[in-house]
């Protein structure tokens, strides 16, 4: 199952909590997360430019991911494609959950958000 930040800023919290509940009920073998990058020529970027979609900042994406992880109760393999958390992927999610939350919390407090945003802006493809 894949988790993506599609609810935007206005629904971020409820999206993270409710998605974690649904994911946990499904008991997936694998949960993956990917950051949301708005590419030129896509409808979602056009919606953001018109003010109809409010994408998250890098810090807000990390905060949403942390909230999702805190609420996820499925013992699965966990893979994240976020820049700061690549070393947190692997099996046995529940035994590593506290470590993942701590790493995300550290990134939220001390991460170089400008560098992360620049990395995302420079992406040309998935």
Annotate each predicted stretch with a short phrase:
Residues 5-18:
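Canonical radical SAM enzyme core domain
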